[in-house]
UniProtKB/Swiss-Prot annotation:
GO CC aspect terms: host cell cytosol; host cell mitochondrion
Protein name: Protein B2
Subunit and partners: Homodimer. Interacts with RNA-directed RNA polymerase.
Note: Encoded on a subgenomic RNA (RNA3) synthesized during replication and which is co-terminal with RNA1.
Organism annotation: Flock house virus
Length: 106
């Protein structure tokens, strides 16, 4: 069975093949309303082909997506909850300096 990455990489070619097969259908002898509907289908297929190609290109430019598709654990770009809590605790436990204004008197 092909890898997830290989399946994604093959999508534009598979779509291209399917679109070419559909575009190869002859329908010039069809009634006008059918011909119009099939013309709309061709336009939709061409747009789908471009959309899939752009999306696959965009996905394969992202290292985290490629790592996932290859079965690797992607590196965490965001800090973990523990790191964020530790940072928050440190920011609240810093000693005050002499430049801080005195607390307000009530």
């Amino acid at each position: 069975m092909p890898s997830k990455l290989a399946l994604i990489q093959e999508l534009p070619d598979r779509i291209q093949t399917a679109v070419e097969a559909a575009m190869g259908m002859s329908y010039q002898d069809a009634p006008n309303n059918v011909r119009r509907d099939l013309d709309n289908l061709h336009a939709c297929l061409n747009k789908a082909k471009l959309t899939v190609s752009r999306m696959v290109t965009s996905l394969l430019e992202k290292p985290s997506v490629v790592a996932y598709l290859e079965g690797k654990a992607p590196e965490e770009a965001k800090p973990t909850l523990e790191e964020r809590l530790r940072k928050l605790e440190l920011s609240h436990s810093l000693p005050t300096t002499g430049s801080d204004p005195p607390p307000a008197k009530l």
